[in-house]
């Protein structure tokens, strides 16, 4: 099976929030907002971005009881809802809408617009991303997301 890889590139960090851009090939699809990036193997439940993973996480479609709809779920394990990385695990990591780190609980938020100064995103991109990934899956592709942390740059 052929593989389609989305690339999530994290580029701006604060104490509680991480901004990124999600690409397909070299084209930006949307902006992302996640909880704080922590050292590999360190997790604070609901306040930690999933770890950088150059090999990529699998993306599947899973029904969310919380959100009451099918959503894109990231995973590494056979149960298709669990990520095991760095000696810790994350479960039910969905791409979804939201505006700030308060909305993430460890999930990547996706949106069309970003306010970098205030670490906010807006105009959710959840539905277009779901539609795109679902179409690739229906066409027989395996879809993954590779996550890269760019170095922190202090502009002060």
Each model region followed by its residue ranges:
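Cell wall/extracellular polymer interaction/catalysis modules
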Residues: 1-143, 149-156
């Amino acid at each position: 099976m052929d593989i389609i890889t989305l690339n999530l590139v994290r580029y701006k960090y604060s104490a509680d929030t991480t901004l990124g851009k999600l690409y397909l090939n070299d084209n930006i699809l949307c902006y992302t907002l996640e909880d704080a990036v922590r050292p590999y193997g360190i997790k604070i439940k609901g306040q930690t971005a999933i770890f950088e993973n150059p090999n990529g996480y699998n993306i599947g479609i899973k029904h969310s009881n919380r959100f009451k709809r099918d959503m894109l779920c990231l995973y590494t394990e056979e149960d298709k809802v669990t990520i095991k990385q760095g000696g810790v695990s994350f479960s039910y990591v969905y791409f979804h809408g939201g505006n700030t780190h308060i909305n993430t609980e460890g999930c990547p938020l996706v949106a069309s617009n970003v306010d970098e100064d205030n670490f906010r995103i807006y105009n959710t991109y959840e539905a277009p991303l779901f539609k795109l990934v679902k179409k690739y899956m229906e066409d027989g592709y395996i879809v993954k997301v590779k996550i890269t942390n760019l170095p922190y740059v202090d502009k002060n």
